Amino acid sequence: MRTLVVLLLVAVANARVYERCEWARLLRNQGMDGYRGISLANWVCLTEWESHYNTRATNHNTDGSTDYGIFQINSRWWCNDSQTPTSNACNIRCSELLTDDVIVAIKCAKRVVRDPNGIGAWVAWRQHCQGQDLSSYLAGCGL
């Protein structure tokens, strides 16, 4: 039990939590501003509400699936966690979404929004970002 607690603390300690403007710059540099018509502010809002910009965020859902990483990408549809029956549409292991190298997560998020639901696939975006004034998400970032 003590070993498990230590391992969990190490995993949390190694999490990368981005500062809002730093994250916005990274997203812009990865071509997310305007990708599929989605503004940078929408991406920043989405990830604020999904993970608070935390690369190691996970959330277990009532259907047995898990959401992974800074975008909270779901194991039922987008990645393989070897526990959930999956479509694995991003063709990745879910653990790849929990690393500090967010390029895989960004590529998968781009794949998600190519589906008919677009950015609406994320409940947090629908509840907190859709139709809102999102200017505060880029305020002070110089973007």
Swiss-Prot record:
Q: Which Gene3D superfamilies match?
A: 1.10.530.10
Which reaction is this enzyme known to catalyze? Hydrolysis of (1->4)-beta-linkages between N-acetylmuramic acid and N-acetyl-D-glucosamine residues in a peptidoglycan and between N-acetyl-D-glucosamine residues in chitodextrins
One biological process term in Gene Ontology: defense response to bacterium
Q: Quick check: keyword Cytoplasm in the entry? A: no
A GO cellular component term found in this entry reads: extracellular region
Q: Where in the cell is it found?
A: Secreted
Q: Known EC number(s)?
A: 3.2.1.17
In this chain the C-type lysozyme domain maps to 16-143
User: In the record, which residues are listed under signal peptide?
Assistant: 1-15
Family annotation (InterPro entries) = Glyco_hydro_22, Glyco_hydro_22_lys, Lysozyme-like_dom_sf
Q: Which cysteines are joined by disulfide bonds?
A: C21-C141, C45-C129, C79-C94, C90-C108
Which residues does the Swiss-Prot or TrEMBL record annotate as the active site? E50, D67
Q: Which GO terms describe its molecular function?
A: lysozyme activity
What CDD domains does the record tag this protein with?
A: LYZ_C
Q: Write the record's keywords in alphabetical order, separated by commas.
A: Antimicrobial, Bacteriolytic enzyme, Disulfide bond, Glycoprotein, Glycosidase, Hydrolase, Secreted, Signal
UniProt key word RNA-binding? no
* Main localisation: secreted
Kindly list every residue the record annotates as glycosylated.
Answer: N80
What is a single Pfam family found in this protein's UniProt entry? Lys
**Note in the entry:** Lysozyme C is capable of both hydrolysis and transglycosylation; it also shows a slight esterase activity. It acts rapidly on both peptide-substituted and unsubstituted peptidoglycan, and slowly on chitin oligosaccharides.
Tell me the subunit arrangement: Monomer.
> What exactly does this protein do?
Lysozymes have primarily a bacteriolytic function; those in tissues and body fluids are associated with the monocyte-macrophage system and enhance the activity of immunoagents.
Q: Which family does it belong to?
A: Belongs to the glycosyl hydrolase 22 family.
Report the protein name in the record: Lysozyme C
Name the source organism.
Paralichthys olivaceus (Bastard halibut)
List the taxonomic lineage: Eukaryota, Metazoa, Chordata, Craniata, Vertebrata
